[in-house]
């Protein structure tokens, strides 16, 4: 879910904190990529024309996306570092259960639309019922390994681990559509990083220090603002929209002071303090030490066996993609990724 309406609030209140850049700007830069978000984007991107299916009628659009988009990044001199979700925090389980219920409802609506042949509704509900599964994750990790592309599995939330990489200056920025990467403290967050290649959209670069300056908030106050807006870890408060949330934080400087001084309807199970702790500390979870992540070798035969023999991809297209990947790596524009993390695949 990310942070509700944060993007809109920042567009209206921090114009200096958001810049449009072409994808080529990130040539020679290292970018941490929220892998789960990328998989979801690739899975729903082909829904209008029907899912891309492999040999056994299993969806392969996530593999199509990871293979060709990653090659395009490498061609541009971008070093992608994919980060996969680890174990979600306990407080997020309620939100995950809600998502499960929404997907089940969407599945029912999809079947009803299918019965009457309403293709527009079918497409809408097909996207809503889409879920990234463990199979998708394992297949993408396998493909990245065969391609020699760096990837990590976070101890918990991928966005938090990506934020840590950025704070440690291991990467230039974090590519995700979830705005809570800012809440976790990532200095730079890149939206439209995947979409820019197919839709020719600019990358929207969010600069956290500039955003905090424009909003006249420190990071702990920004965390409280995001909690008021609505996040994955606790519900929103009735009657609190973006404008009011920002006004309350600027007036009282913390949720604790707001609750002491304002007459608000607060649910008994509103666990805002737990959300504060997660946003304030989750990105620091895990052993930190000097660590070197280098590009691994490209396994052409392994890629062909996986994508062509197992998944039914076109051999000529796959080989052309591998050639592009090899040639781009030979140019020596990628280098090595030196960062301070524990390898956790």
Curated annotation (Swiss-Prot):
GO molecular function: 5'-3' exonuclease activity; 5'-flap endonuclease activity; DNA binding; magnesium ion binding
Alphabetized UniProt keyword annotations: DNA damage, DNA repair, DNA replication, Endonuclease, Exonuclease, Hydrolase, Magnesium, Metal-binding, Mitochondrion, Nuclease, Nucleus, Phosphoprotein
A Pfam family matched in the record: XPG_N
Residue ranges, annotated region (I-domain): 121-252
InterPro entries for the chain: 5-3_exonuclease_C_sf, Flap_endonuc, HhH2, PIN-like_dom_sf, XPG-I_dom, XPG/Rad2, XPG_DNA_repair_N
Top enzyme class: hydrolase
Modifications the protein undergoes after translation, according to the UniProt entry: Phosphorylated. Phosphorylation upon DNA damage induces relocalization to the nuclear plasma.
Binding residue positions for Mg(2+) 2: 178, 180, 232
Name of the protein this chain belongs to: Flap endonuclease 1
